[in-house]
Amino acid sequence: MRKDRNLRRRALIRLSLARNTRRLILSVAAFILATLFVLVACSAPQNESGQSNNQQPAARDWKPVEQALGKAGSVQPGDVYKVSLPRSDLKVTVGDVQVKALLALGSWVAFKKAGNMTMVMGDLVLTEDEVTAVLTKLQEGGVEQTALHNHVLHESPRIMYMHIHAMADAVKIAKAIHDALTLSKTPFAAPAAGNQTQDLGIDTKQLDQIMGQSGKVNGGVYQFSVPRAEKIMENDMEVPPSMGVAHAINFQPTGGGKAAITGDFVLISSEVNPVIRALRDNGIEVTALHSHMLFESPRLFFMHFWGNDDALKLARGIRAALDKTNSAKT
């Protein structure tokens, strides 16, 4: 009798040990799986906003916006959908330089989701005769103007730049912008694909070295985009560099190793005059100084410039000016 009880007790002990061992194995397995999941998530490629590329808005359906605006765009870093509308219809000269559309005549509109709404910003290139009709139509469609001004000097015909802002339904705003731009001669057709590896006749490798980053060929122009180091906010919403708050530096070859340069520096107030002095010390003209937005933080000033000289000499002048700014390090 006692022997049977001992046997039953030993059997129960073995069963209890087996159950505890099974629970331990399952717990360890669950911990390992959870750890692997976290490691995979953390190692996923990320965009500039720190968001995993697996969740990029490339998967987001921007087709209705494209259809409403009448032009396709592309997804940029910072979850931005950006549409370029270069004024290839315009024949603009500054002195003896025939200005290419991607040097100083590039309209653009950018969209960024904000919950159920979308923040829209843009810069529209217009002739003087187009300004009033486009402005009025934009206001009727709920699109606000935040600036209207020149970017360069002595251009012919006279060109104006209208900066816009809206916070509303993306499709509604896209249609409003389309309807306004139809009152101008802005082309909506996609431009012919350019040769992105063409020899521009200027030493782009040296330009990259001087500027401290790689530029890109776009429509016969060599372009640099240099973000600021700090976050830019508009109405408590972050504005990514691709929405017009990065320094834009453009080189258009003009022969013999020379280039016409223009673009804009994005500056806080304490940087304005040091940048002016750096540009003038290097023979680069300052052609405009103004705001582009209304409620940004920190307060920003946009300084436009012009030069037509040896491309490497001008690049050194631009580099000297950039060194006076709080720009992101590359």
Task: Specify the residue positions occupied by each region the protein language model found.
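N-terminal secretory signal peptides that target proteins for export/translocation
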Residues: 1-22
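Terminal low-complexity, intrinsically disordered regions
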Residues: 2, 34, 44-48
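Sec-dependent signal peptide hydrophobic core
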Residues: 25-33
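C-terminal motif of bacterial Sec signal peptides marking the signal peptidase cleavage site
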Residues: 40-41
